[in-house]
């Protein structure tokens, strides 16, 4: 039975975590200097769908998450990607083999959201099951009260797109491959991450070392 059929049947589920699920993971300080020049990173930006299962080293994961949606102006709490009226409405979930975690930008740490291997629920493509990291972009509409209700999904989608592009630009500097995906069983993923009714799954993004 394919993952798509399981999704249609409402039976696409997480798998047991591949190892102990730590309640929190303190990330080392991110590398904020160096990397490819911007124009070189743009020239190398591409989507890849063939991944090795090798886990990303923690320092690399730390810098990736900071580049994606970290705090780059601590005195103001502003981030590496824009958000309308500075709502900072995007929650970035990190699906690892050992569990799913919420990225806490202020503490620069990961907090356990689900002690399960949620990767297979982040998309219908087979490669999401084996890649070491799947990012899930979730909009929290409760933080968007200054934005008109009819505009919130659109504004959040723009913010998620900016974060995803940060990941795309970081990837070639770190020798990584990535692809963003919208073909998702959002109901199953919301259940797996125990999201509230105010939280909306927007996109997923797979990251890892290219297998070819």
Predicted features along the sequence, with ranges:
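Small-aliphatic-rich amphipathic alpha-helix that forms the alpha element of a beta-alpha
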Residues: 45, 64, 92, 133-189
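Short coil/turn connectors at secondary-structure junctions
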Residues: 129-133, 198-200
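Beta-rich nucleic-acid/ligand-interaction surfaces
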Residues: 82-86, 184-191
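Solvent-exposed coil/turn segments that connect beta secondary-structure elements
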Residues: 97-98, 140, 210
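N-terminal amphipathic, basic helical "cap/leader" segment at the start of enzyme domains
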Residues: 1-131
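Short, surface-exposed helix-loop/turn micro-motifs enriched in polar/charged residues
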Residues: 84, 178-181, 197
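A glycine-rich helix N-cap at a beta->alpha junction
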Residues: 193-212
């Amino acid at each position: 039975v394919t993952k798509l059929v399981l999704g249609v049947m409402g039976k696409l589920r997480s798998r047991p975590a591949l190892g102990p699920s730590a309640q929190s993971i303190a990330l080392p300080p991110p590398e904020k200097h160096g990397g490819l020049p911007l124009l070189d990173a743009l020239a190398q930006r591409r989507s890849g769908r063939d991944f090795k299962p090798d886990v990303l080293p923690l320092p690399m994961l730390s810098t990736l998450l900071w580049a994606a949606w970290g705090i780059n102006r601590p005195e103001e709490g502003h981030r590496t990607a824009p958000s309308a009226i500075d709502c900072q409405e995007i929650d970035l979930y990190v699906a690892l083999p050992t569990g799913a975690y919420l990225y806490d930008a202020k503490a620069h740490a990961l907090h356990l959201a689900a002690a399960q291997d949620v990767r297979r629920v982040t998309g219908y493509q087979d490669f999401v099951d084996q890649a070491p990291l799947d990012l899930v972009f979730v909009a929290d509409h409760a933080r968007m009260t200054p934005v008109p209700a009819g505009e919130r999904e659109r504004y959040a989608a723009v913010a998620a797109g900016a974060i995803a592009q940060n990941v795309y630009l970081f990837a070639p500097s770190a020798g990584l491959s990535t692809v963003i995906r919208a073909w998702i069983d959002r109901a199953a993923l919301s259940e797996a991450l125990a999201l509230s009714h105010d939280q909306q799954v927007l996109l997923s993004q797979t990251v890892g070392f290219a297998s070819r």
